[in-house]
Amino acid sequence: MKTFVLFVILLCLTFLSISKSETCPFSQSLVSGASATYYTDPNAGNCGYENLMGPLGPGNLFIAALGPNLYNNGKNCGQCFNISSPYTNRSVVIMATDSCPDSGYCQRSSHFDLSTQAFDVLGAQSIGVLEGLTYYKVPCGVNGNVKIMMKDGSNDYWTAFLIYNSKVTIKDVSVKITGKSTYTSLTQSSYNYWISPNMVPGSFDVRIESVGGEFIYITIPKVESRKQYETSSQFSVDGCVGTPSGPSGGLGSPSTGASIGTPSDASSLTLYALFSLTILFLVMLN
C-alpha cells in the first residue's frame, strides 16, 4: 500500500511539473538560418515607442527592426528575442521596436536589422551581414505593470491606444463604453496602435488580452491626448525558458538564456516522465 501511495504522489508531482512547463504564452521553438544587419538610428521606430530611452521605450538600445515576415504588421512589436551567433559564440536579448521594409536582406523570412549595440555582441561590424544565426522568443523582463497611452490627437470620438511595458505581445485590445454591456475589439495598426473610431464622452473600460489569452482590465475616466496609465498587473510568463531578470529586463545581456539551448517539447517531456515513472514503479514492485 505504501508503494502505491508513493507512486501516486510521484505521478501527481510529475504532472504538476509538466503543466508548469506548458504555461509559457508563446512558442519558444529554436529557429535557425536567421541573418542580421545593423542600423545607426534606432529611435522613433515603427512600433510607436518613440525615444528608446524615453517613457515609452525599453530603456536601452538593444533593439531590432524586423523584416516583414517577423514584423507581421506589428503583431511582434514588443516581442523579445534571444539571438545566438556562430561568429562570437555569444547571444544577446533584444526587443522588436521597428520594422525593416527594405527590399534587400529584410525580405528574408528571419532577418533582424539590429542596433549597433546588439550587433556588436554577435559579430564585427566589418562583416556587414551575419549569417547562420539562431533565435527563439523570450519574455521581456520589464519592470512594473503593463501600461497604456492614448495617441496624440485622441478625442471623445476617436482615439488609438498604445500598449507597452508588457512581458509578452498583445493579442487583442477591446473597449466597453459607458452604458454598453459588451466589449468591442479594436483593430491593430501596422504602427502598433489599436484604433477605436467610435468613442463617446465619459469613462470607459479597456480589456487587454495577451498572446497567451490572459486578460488585464483598466477603467479610464476620459479620453485625453497622450495620457498614460499604468494598469494594476503584468502578464504571467511562468514556464518560459530564458526569462530575463534585473534592470532593463536583461536586454543586451549576452548571458541571459544563452546556454538554455532548444526548449523541450511538451509531448516529449510527457512521454519521458511516463517512461521514468513506469521504470520507478517496476523497481519498487521488486
Swiss-Prot record:
Localization in the cell: Membrane
Topological domains annotated Extracellular: 22-265
Disulfide bonds: C47-C77, C80-C140
Chain ranges of the Expansin-like EG45 domain: 44-145
Origin: domain of life: Eukaryota
Pfam (any one): DPBB_1
Entry-linked CDD domains: DPBB_EXP_N-like
Signal sequence segment: 1-21
Keyword terms: Disulfide bond, Glycoprotein, Membrane, Signal, Transmembrane, Transmembrane helix
SMART domains membership: DPBB_1 (SM00837)
Classification via InterPro entries: Expansin/allergen_DPBB_dom, Expansin_CBD_sf, Expansin_CellWall, Expansin_EXLX1-like, RlpA-like_DPBB, RlpA-like_sf
Transmembrane segments: 266-286
Similarity annotation: Belongs to the expansin family. Expansin A subfamily.
Functional summary from the UniProt entry: May serve to lubricate the movement of the cellulose microfibrils during cell growth and wall extension and/or they may serve to maintain the fluid state of the slug cell wall.
NCBIfam families: expansin_EXLX1
Protein name: Expansin-like protein 1
